[in-house]
Amino acid sequence: MQTTTITMGDVQYPYRLGTGCVDGIVTRLGELEASHYLVLCDATVAELYGHDLAARLRRSAGPASVLTHPAGEEHKGLGTLDTLADAALHAGVDRRGVVVALGGGVTGNIAGLLAALLFRGIRLVHVPTTVVAMLDSVLSLKQAVNAQVGKNLVGTFYPPVEVLADTAMLGTLPVREIRSGLCEVVKNALAIRPSMIDFLAAELRPDGRYADDVLRWMIDESVAAKAQVTEHDKYERREGLVLEYGHTVGHALEHASHGAVSHGAGVGVGMVAAAEVARRLGHVDADLVELHRELVGKVGVATTLPADVPTEEITYRLGFDNKRGYQPLPADHYAMVLLADVGQPLYQDGLPLTPAPRALVDEVVRELADAPSRIGASVGSAGGAS
């Protein structure tokens, strides 16, 4: 397995990446000498990989249990966390236990917060099974669940002891989840690492089918992009805020859709919205907006909003965006990550955040919902395992 050391301030952990390397994953987990391995996943991932992984751990490492949670963003809440905490304690976990987050971003967030809270902190290992998780969520210390009014509003920062990733697991993903991850790759290219753009313009495929070497390149480049902005900002409160590009409208859409819109698809159209806001504020020209539409469209997701999600539900949730409070703003403004050009976020008061008038942002949201054309697949297309 290829090993990269992830560094965020005083936090370091290894990211081990391979293909067809489940035996290596079991070996690495066994070396942690846990008193109990809690393999946390949704029911679909449990059938694909979870029960097998737990059985292998029981044979070679020690006691192991599979804990499942309901699939979907709509179940990423405190109720699910409470149920899992009770189940973990009844399974026999103690302070020497290890939580194994086996799945996508939803599982990783739930497992991360569970590990942080059990006995005030036990070890966490990410075994990501989606593109979003492999190249985005496991490269962050943020662990959070949703509140009723918005995404990721209840949480903390907690590092894994390591990440163990097998790209062969991506072979069972539905196309929706591949596209979701690729939207985060586009975000990294537009906001942080524009050297990626030409390759992506040539290689992105709306059908979501990629050779393993292309996916490995995207993961490697995304690791490098995140390192650029988090190496000295482990809490993502300064330059790391650029990773929120596209997430203001994206999170609001994802939450308003009750999980029908994937995280990446929300971020995709959220980046288009951010580019259009920046254009209307005079920071970028129409060509940059078109570049956003082109790259997001090539991923295979929509660059406009789905007709079945009421715009008032989206604009309501914009008021609960998780970037509130970083800057003193008038009540009629949102704090948004906006660009001056590719790889050049706009800064104010030392942060990559720009005050954007609510009336303007809400207008852009309404216009994206009213746009007659769609590029690529519907944002709210059916999904699968995460």
From Swiss-Prot:
<dbReference type="InterPro" id="IPR050071">
    <property type="entry name" value="Dehydroquinate_synthase"/>
</dbReference>
<feature type="binding site">
    <location>
        <position position="184"/>
    </location>
    <ligand>
        <name>Co(2+)</name>
    </ligand>
</feature>
<keyword id="KW-0520">NAD</keyword>
<comment type="pathway">
    <text>Metabolic intermediate biosynthesis; 2-deoxystreptamine biosynthesis; 2-deoxystreptamine from D-glucose 6-phosphate: step 1/4.</text>
</comment>
<comment type="pathway">
    <text>Antibiotic biosynthesis; tobramycin biosynthesis.</text>
</comment>
<keyword id="KW-0045">Antibiotic biosynthesis</keyword>
<feature type="active site">
    <location>
        <position position="142"/>
    </location>
</feature>
<dbReference type="GO" id="GO:0003856">
    <property type="term" value="F:3-dehydroquinate synthase activity"/>
</dbReference>
<dbReference type="InterPro" id="IPR030963">
    <property type="entry name" value="DHQ_synth_fam"/>
</dbReference>
<keyword id="KW-0456">Lyase</keyword>
<keyword id="KW-0479">Metal-binding</keyword>
<dbReference type="Pfam" id="PF01761">
    <property type="entry name" value="DHQ_synthase"/>
</dbReference>
<feature type="binding site">
    <location>
        <position position="42"/>
    </location>
    <ligand>
        <name>NAD(+)</name>
    </ligand>
</feature>
<comment type="function">
    <text>Catalyzes the intramolecular carbocycle formation from D-glucose-6-phosphate to 2-deoxy-scyllo-inosose (DOI).</text>
</comment>
<dbReference type="GO" id="GO:0009073">
    <property type="term" value="P:aromatic amino acid family biosynthetic process"/>
</dbReference>
<feature type="binding site">
    <location>
        <begin position="105"/>
        <end position="109"/>
    </location>
    <ligand>
        <name>NAD(+)</name>
    </ligand>
</feature>
<keyword id="KW-0170">Cobalt</keyword>
<dbReference type="GO" id="GO:0017000">
    <property type="term" value="P:antibiotic biosynthetic process"/>
</dbReference>
<feature type="binding site">
    <location>
        <begin position="140"/>
        <end position="142"/>
    </location>
    <ligand>
        <name>NAD(+)</name>
    </ligand>
</feature>
<comment type="similarity">
    <text>Belongs to the sugar phosphate cyclases superfamily. DOI synthase family.</text>
</comment>
<dbReference type="InterPro" id="IPR030960">
    <property type="entry name" value="DHQS/DOIS_N"/>
</dbReference>
<feature type="binding site">
    <location>
        <position position="247"/>
    </location>
    <ligand>
        <name>Co(2+)</name>
    </ligand>
</feature>
<feature type="active site">
    <location>
        <position position="244"/>
    </location>
</feature>
<feature type="binding site">
    <location>
        <begin position="73"/>
        <end position="76"/>
    </location>
    <ligand>
        <name>NAD(+)</name>
    </ligand>
</feature>
<protein>
    <recommendedName>
        <fullName>2-deoxy-scyllo-inosose synthase</fullName>
        <ecNumber>4.2.3.124</ecNumber>
    </recommendedName>
</protein>
<feature type="binding site">
    <location>
        <begin position="129"/>
        <end position="130"/>
    </location>
    <ligand>
        <name>NAD(+)</name>
    </ligand>
</feature>
<dbReference type="GO" id="GO:0046872">
    <property type="term" value="F:metal ion binding"/>
</dbReference>
<dbReference type="InterPro" id="IPR056179">
    <property type="entry name" value="DHQS_C"/>
</dbReference>
<dbReference type="Pfam" id="PF24621">
    <property type="entry name" value="DHQS_C"/>
</dbReference>
<feature type="binding site">
    <location>
        <begin position="151"/>
        <end position="152"/>
    </location>
    <ligand>
        <name>NAD(+)</name>
    </ligand>
</feature>
<feature type="binding site">
    <location>
        <position position="263"/>
    </location>
    <ligand>
        <name>Co(2+)</name>
    </ligand>
</feature>
